[in-house]
A protein has these predicted regions:
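Interfacial helix-cap and linker-helix signal at transmembrane-aqueous boundaries
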Residues: 1-9, 109, 146-147, 238-245
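Intracellular loop-helix junctions on the cytosolic face of multi-pass helical membrane proteins
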Residues: 1-99, 148, 262-286
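Hydrophobic core of transmembrane alpha-helices in multi-pass small-molecule transporters
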Residues: 92, 179-201
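Short amphipathic helix-loop junctions that connect adjacent transmembrane helices
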Residues: 93, 102-124
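Intracellular juxtamembrane helix-capping segments at the cytosolic ends
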Residues: 104, 197-211
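Loop-to-transmembrane helix entry/capping segments in MFS-fold secondary transporters
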Residues: 121-122, 212-222
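Helix-to-loop junctions at the C-terminal end of transmembrane segments
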Residues: 138-155, 241-242
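C-terminal ends and interior cores of transmembrane alpha-helices
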Residues: 161-179
Length: 286
């Protein structure tokens, strides 16, 4: 059975490729390997991660006290100083990226006649699953290294630009629809590297804002808000794309990065936060 794309409004062509092999077995082997890798990672972190003396439970509650402590933890989070700018940052900093991440793969898989790049699932797997992951990891490592030298506040704006400006590569890809795998892969690598570098600022700010009493619970709340900031815009991204098309959608995504820049002006961050402490190079103010 062949199903045509409802978005096609002119004649098109299609190519079919027959493949043999046990596809269910291939998927099974893939997930068994992944499960084994996660087990290795678990064992590594179980025995390698440090256990500082300060890492102890600070609250011991049972029964009714447990519920009162639960709500007290939320209350203490939402009454923190500068909670307004912090919430805005957590929800808006990735407003553009939260929409791109939902539509990047459909954009690459959709036919060229409907504005996509017409790639195969194998192509997309290579671009995002290999090249993109490597670029993302390298960007994150570099972000951590530079933040340890000058601190979060120093790198906040550069990291914001690094996360958001590379979204322009999707505007370019949607307007030119190149066929070169090298060009598409390089574009995705740039975008993912910038995202990894910029996301360092997001993670560091969550750690910074969660500091104090109930810091573990407060960090968990921050991660929940992080997920909310990705989920809600992502829910409507497909609807927006169907209305305006890929070209205008990616322009819209770039516009959506503006609120994330605006909120940076209202964040209050200790200039020494994030700087790696060393007897030879102590943070400023110590």
């Amino acid at each position: 059975m062949v199903q045509l794309d409802s978005k096609l409004d002119e004649a098109t062509t299609a190519f079919y490729e027959g493949r043999s092999g046990n596809i269910p077995l291939a998927w099974t082997i893939t997930f068994v390997i992944l499960a084994g890798m996660f087990l290795v990672f678990f064992l590594y972190h179980r025995f390698i991660l440090p256990r500082p003396a300060s890492d102890n439970a600070t609250v011991h509650a049972e029964g009714e006290n447990l519920f009162s402590e639960f709500f007290a933890t939320f209350k203490s989070f939402f009454t923190k100083e500068n909670i307004g700018p912090a919430l805005a940052f957590l929800l808006l900093f990735r407003l553009g990226e939260s929409q791109i991440v939902k539509l990047a793969s459909p954009f690459m898989l959709d036919a060229r006649e409907v504005g996509g790049l017409g790639l195969t699932t194998g192509d997309v797997g290579l671009i995002y699953g290999t090249i993109g992951i490597l670029a993302l990891t390298l960007g994150g490592i570099l972000g951590g290294l530079v933040a340890s030298k000058h601190g979060l506040k120093f790198w906040l704006w550069p990291m914001a630009f690094a996360m958001n400006l590379p979204n322009l590569v999707f505007v370019y890809l949607s307007y030119t629809t190149p066929q070169s795998m090298w060009l598409i892969s390089a574009s995705v690598a740039v975008e993912q590297f910038g995202y990894g570098f910029g996301f360092t600022a997001y993670m560091l700010y969550m750690i910074y804002f969660a500091a104090g009493n109930h810091k573990t619970a407060h960090y968990a709340i921050c991660t929940g808000l992080m997920a909310l900031g990705m989920m809600i815009p992502g829910m409507i991204s497909g609807w927006i794309q169907e209305i305006v098309g890929y070209e205008n959608f990616f322009i819209w995504v770039v516009i959506c990065t503006i609120p994330g820049f605006i909120v940076l002006k209202f964040l209050k961050i200790d200039p020494t936060f994030g700087i790696k402490k060393s007897p030879l190079n102590p943070p400023k103010g110590e």
